[in-house]
Amino acid sequence: MSTDRYEIDRGKDFGHLEHAPIVEAVIEIKCPPQVPWNEDTIPDEVGKLLSGYQLLDSRSEYSQTVNFEDNVPIPESMEKVGWKGVRYRSEDESYIAAFNRDGFVFSRVGRYETWEKFSAEASRVWKVHRSLARPSDVHRIGLRFINRIRLPGSGIDLDDFIYPGPQPPKNLGFPIVSFLHKDTFAVPGNPYLINIIRTSSPSPSAGGDVDYAIILDIDVYLQETFEVDDLKIEGHLEDMRILKNEVFWGSIPRPLLENLRGDSG
């Protein structure tokens, strides 16, 4: 296992996948506000500054008290501990932005287009959060892409759709009904960590047809504190995008990649 510094090539061109299986893309910036984060004022302030979006919901945080009786947990009560934040959704329902007490979350749901469009809109909306919250420090940045790869049916070789594919124990040739696998990787010489989850969704039921798919969930993140700096944040996100692409392209067998590429080449 090499521990040499991994050079992240920001200029690397991965090409375009016309049929990319992305179902959600998320940017998260953990940065506590330096001003009061009040339910009475923040939702309206966001609405005034954020064009092209409408209020989706307002969310609170709760704690649950659990008692034990004969070593069996018994939930007792839910208590509101504070207001978490507000979510706004774009008028075309393709973006959701969360303005939270602990930071900012921006999601693309549905059909993904390009990184340039996604990151540009995230940057625009992030500036609204920054202007209201006035954070001084960033504690975590995350970039997460969730892919759903549909399978044509049962009785297929999963190695044709995901690498590495799930395997039974060496001494047992049992068929795989469902699987869940998680890895966390460090990037040598860089401050990033990568969580990779490969799982089946939904699990097939005995005797019934199901829409069977593989979920490839890639989460690249940086967990260290630095002063808020938009150029620095953009640089980290660009590094994370490259790492995310490296993981995706290294997880999908070439014949499937060609199918996902489509006619655009």
PLM regions with names:
Residues D211-G265:
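Long, compositionally biased interface segments
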Residues M1-F99, K232:
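N-terminal low-complexity, intrinsically disordered segments
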Residues R87-R130:
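Hydrophobic alpha-helical segments and helix pairs
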Residues L17, P32, P36, V105-E116, ...:
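Short, charged/polar micro-motifs that form catalytic or ligand-binding hotspots
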Residues K12-F14, M78-D92, I96, S107, ...:
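Aromatic/basic-lined ligand-recognition segments
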Residues W37-K48, E113-S136, F226, D230, ...:
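Extended intrinsically disordered, low-complexity coil regions enriched in Ser, Thr, Gly, Ala
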Residues L56-D70, S131-I149, I176-S178, E246-G265:
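Short glycine-rich, low-complexity/disordered patches
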Residues P21-E28, Y95-Y112, V138-I146, V210-L222:
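Glycine-rich, often proline-containing surface loops adjacent to acidic residues and nearby aromatics
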